[in-house]
């Protein structure tokens, strides 16, 4: 084997290892996951399946990966709620969609809405969910304070009709408005 061939093989081997290591560091390692069935809420005509959200453990926190369709375009408030229910309940004499889920999950008693990485906010505050013009949502969001699937089992995920400013001002709970879609995390 001549010197040029040997040098070319050595360079090729080094490049292959470098590319493999770079690929390894730029991906989120996959861990255990839960698939949550999500339904659009309709207390009068019954809920309708709109897809799933897969919750996966990663080195950076829990990753919520939606595979949803049939939703209204735009940013939507996306949260973990305290109860494992998507049932309607009565509020002020009116049947309200998804009220059985309770409020935003707040096991540490923060009593305020905020960013997903903010220590003094509800633990159930997630990044807003983006729904494209065709009604689909597939972009994952990261919840860095949530580390294990057992942290969220026995609760529900909720998608609100409006966006989320991650604050209680000017409207409480990010201003997301009514509950639009929900899934129980089992």
From Swiss-Prot:
How does the cofactor attach, per the note?
A: Binds 1 copper ion per subunit. Binds 1 zinc ion per subunit.
Instruction: Tell me the protein family, please.
Output: Belongs to the Cu-Zn superoxide dismutase family.
Q: What protein does this entry describe?
A: Superoxide dismutase [Cu-Zn]
The organism of origin for this protein = Neisseria meningitidis serogroup A / serotype 4A (strain DSM 15465 / Z2491)
Q: How does it assemble?
A: Homodimer.
Q: Tell me its cofactors.
A: Cu cation; Zn(2+)
Residues the record lists as binding Cu cation: 79, 81, 104, 160
UniProt KW keywords: Antioxidant, Copper, Disulfide bond, Metal-binding, Oxidoreductase, Periplasm, Signal, Zinc
Q: Tell me the superkingdom of the source.
A: Bacteria
GO MF annotation list: copper ion binding; superoxide dismutase activity
Keyword Disulfide bond belongs to the record = yes
Q: Which InterPro entries match?
A: SOD-like_Cu/Zn_dom_sf (IPR036423), SOD_Cu/Zn_/chaperone (IPR024134), SOD_Cu/Zn_BS (IPR018152), SOD_Cu_Zn_dom (IPR001424)
Instruction: One GO cellular component term, please give it.
Output: periplasmic space
Q: Where is the signal peptide?
A: 1-22
Q: Which residues of this UniProt protein bind Zn(2+)? A: 104, 113, 122, 125
**Which Enzyme Commission number(s) are listed?**
1.15.1.1
